[in-house]
Amino acid sequence: MDTSLLEAIQRYVQLEEARKPFLLCQLTKMLQFVLANLAPMRRYQIVDLIKGLVRNRVRVKQTEFQQYEILNRLSKALRESASNNYWNGYSAAICLSHDIDYEMGHAFVPNMAEINLDHGVKASFNFLTGWDYEIDHEVVSSLVEQGFEIGLHGHTHDIALGCRRRSRIEKDLRNSLDFITRYAVSGFRAPALSIGDNLLAVLSRLGFTYDSSFSGVDRYTGVVSFCLPFRFTAFGMWEIPLSIQDTYFFRDRNLSDTDALEEAISIMDAIVAMGGVAVINCHPCIVKNHLEFYRGVLSYIAKQNRVWNPCLIDLVLFLKNRSDANVQGHENWGCNTSLQ
């Protein structure tokens, strides 16, 4: 895939992010301040209510994938990569991640890992280091031994993290350095997908290899905008765009397990057909009440013979090797090559 196309995609993403108004960032900061002083369960309920209000007011303008010249080029390149088995000998890739937001989710992590193992599907578990649960290091060590990747979701679940000053972000994330070092963490998912230049700069300075916070699929229509990893040359980091979140189906739209699974498969089918990378994020605190949906997603992934299922870091290491980049020390970054 040519460098000019990847640079064009990067410019497109930056333009899309630049459209977020300044006032929205300030309102988000104020909301985070209020939420930070609430009990965890009350906080969760209020966030749920706010998302419901937004859902009822939003009017979605559907956008076709072919409308943008950049995306036309991307679509063509993706189809070529699919026919050439670009992704480590496979025509497409599907990566699974789990953001651990609350204590109820943290408690369900061992069960979730067991379900993943039953289906032979790899995943990345992203933890908060200073939120409303105390990390069980025996559980995390067990995840590593079983072949899962450990990532960082932040120190606290600061939904305005990407809007804050660089010094504030660095101070916050440095609280997680012991965890980062202990588990050789290389990947990040921003709380509430709150990403920005300041956050990316801090992540790069702290030695992160990739971020997966940009959304590449419309949460209401399922229209795929982009599904290809790209590199931020200014930060020396990779971005693996997020395709699906369980929150889109259950918190934002209140779908049944059956309807949610149907939409998830439709999105994955579209990305696989284009030869792209689908990233599915499922929260343990949500999945525990939607196991029919979750097992359906895992079954779909397990049955895809032409699709690669790496941990996110292993996908990035493949891309770094593919571009002849320097990957010194990669043995310590990746998750195990096979699930036990």
Where would I find each of the regions flagged by the language model?
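Structural detector of well-ordered beta-strand residues that form the stable sheet scaffold
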Residues: S124-N126, G151, R189, T209-D211, ...
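Conserved strand-turn element in the central/C-terminal portion of the radical SAM core barrel
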Residues: S186-G196
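An active-site-proximal "capping" alpha-helix that borders the catalytic cofactor pocket
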Residues: I169-I180
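A short acidic, helix-capping loop that chelates divalent metal ions and anchors anionic groups
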Residues: D158-C163, F249-R251
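Structural recognition of alpha->loop->beta junctions
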Residues: L143-F148, D178-A184, I301-R306
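Acidic, His- and aromatic-enriched active-site or binding-groove loops in soluble protein domains
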Residues: G147-H155, G207-V223, R231-T233
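Terminal accessory/targeting
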Residues: M1-I135, R182, D197-L206, V217, ...
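Metal-dependent catalytic neighborhoods of phosphoester/phosphodiester hydrolases
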Residues: H137-V139, G162-E170, L199-L203
